[in-house]
Amino acid sequence: MMCPRILMKCKHDSDCLPGCVCLEHIEYCG
């Protein structure tokens, strides 16, 4: 499943939409 291209701040993968992971070094989902 593709990650929607929406900038979302995160600390953990669970903060992101389905299909996304948290890029912890920039604190955004991707």
Curated annotation (Swiss-Prot):
Annotated GO MF terms: serine-type endopeptidase inhibitor activity
Chief location of this protein within or outside the cell: secreted
GO CC terms in record: extracellular region
SMART domains, per database record: PTI (SM00286)
Keyword Nucleotidyltransferase: no
Protein keywords: Disulfide bond, Knottin, Protease inhibitor, Secreted, Serine protease inhibitor
Keyword Cytoplasm (UniProt): no
Compartments in which it is found: Secreted
CDD domains linked: PlantTI
SUPFAM superfamilies with a match to the protein in the record: Plant inhibitors of proteinases and amylases
Disulfide bridge map: C3-C20, C10-C22, C16-C29
Site residues (Reactive bond), renumbered to this chain: R5, I6
Free-text domain note: The presence of a 'disulfide through disulfide knot' structurally defines this protein as a knottin.
Family: Belongs to the protease inhibitor I7 (squash-type serine protease inhibitor) family.
Task performed by this protein: Inhibits trypsin.
Protein name per the record: Trypsin inhibitor 4
Source organism: Cucumis sativus (Cucumber)
Taxon lineage: Eukaryota, Viridiplantae, Streptophyta, Embryophyta, Tracheophyta
